[in-house]
């Protein structure tokens, strides 16, 4: 959320508008994400992949590989952290994700074996793809647009935290469209207000 106080965002539009851009981006993003049922679709994909790859029900290798891959990939932090890294905003979110994934993988590997370690391959490819998207966005977006996108990402991180701590169950993946909408709303506020 420190991006909210970024001077490029604060100076790009009239006083009070940066928070409106962030809130409106989250609102419209949540509406789009809920309409598209992003969270439900990700869960459905995970369940289908898991059942199709583990037909015999006896292979802990496949169970470990699929379960770990899905848990480490299906989540907003994998996308948000990789995009932030690609845009040059730092790797702090990826470090947080890696730490959480590391502890989770220890628990999984104890019961499911070496398949958990091999899940790092699809996770690496997935995160690299999102980092490439971030590299592209970082080259075409203005600083204030990146700050708006990062501020929205900070709100998503709060949602992820509440979910992980079991304080509030939120469909954070449904808020992912807000990341794409925030730079557009920031541009509109910058040019027309």
Q: Which residues does each predicted region cover?
A:
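Helix-loop-helix junctions within the multi-pass membrane cores of secondary transporters/permeases
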Residues: 60-136
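Interfacial loop-to-transmembrane junctions
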Residues: 162-181
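Membrane helix-loop-helix hairpins that form the core translocation module of multi-pass transporters
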Residues: 1-44
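Hydrophobic transmembrane alpha-helices of secondary-active transporters
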Residues: 1-11, 32, 103-109, 151-165
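Alpha-helical transmembrane segments of helical membrane proteins, especially in multi-pass transport
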Residues: 116-158, 163
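Interfacial loop-to-helix junctions that mark the boundaries of transmembrane helices
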Residues: 8-21, 87-93, 140-149, 170
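Intrinsically disordered, low-complexity non-transmembrane regions of multi-pass membrane transporters
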Residues: 38-64
């Amino acid at each position: 959320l420190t991006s909210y106080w970024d001077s490029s965002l604060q100076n790009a539009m009239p006083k009070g508008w940066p928070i409106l851009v962030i809130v409106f981006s989250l609102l419209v993003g949540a509406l789009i994400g809920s309409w598209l049922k992003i969270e439900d679709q990700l869960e459905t994909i995970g369940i289908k992949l898991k059942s199709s790859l583990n037909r015999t029900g006896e292979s802990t290798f496949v169970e470990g590989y699929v379960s770990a891959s899905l848990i480490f990939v299906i989540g907003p932090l994998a996308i948000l952290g990789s995009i932030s890294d690609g845009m040059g905003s730092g790797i702090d979110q990826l470090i947080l994700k890696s730490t959480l994934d590391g502890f989770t993988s220890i628990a999984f590997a104890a019961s499911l074996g070496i398949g958990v370690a091999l899940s790092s391959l699809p996770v690496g490819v997935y995160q690299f793809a999102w980092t490439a998207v971030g590299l592209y966005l970082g080259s075409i977006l203005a600083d204030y647009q990146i700050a708006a996108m990062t501020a929205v990402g900070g709100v998503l991180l709060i949602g992820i935290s509440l979910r992980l701590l079991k304080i509030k169950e939120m469909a954070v993946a449904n808020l992912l469209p807000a990341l794409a909408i925030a730079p557009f709303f920031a541009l509109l506020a910058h040019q027309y207000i």
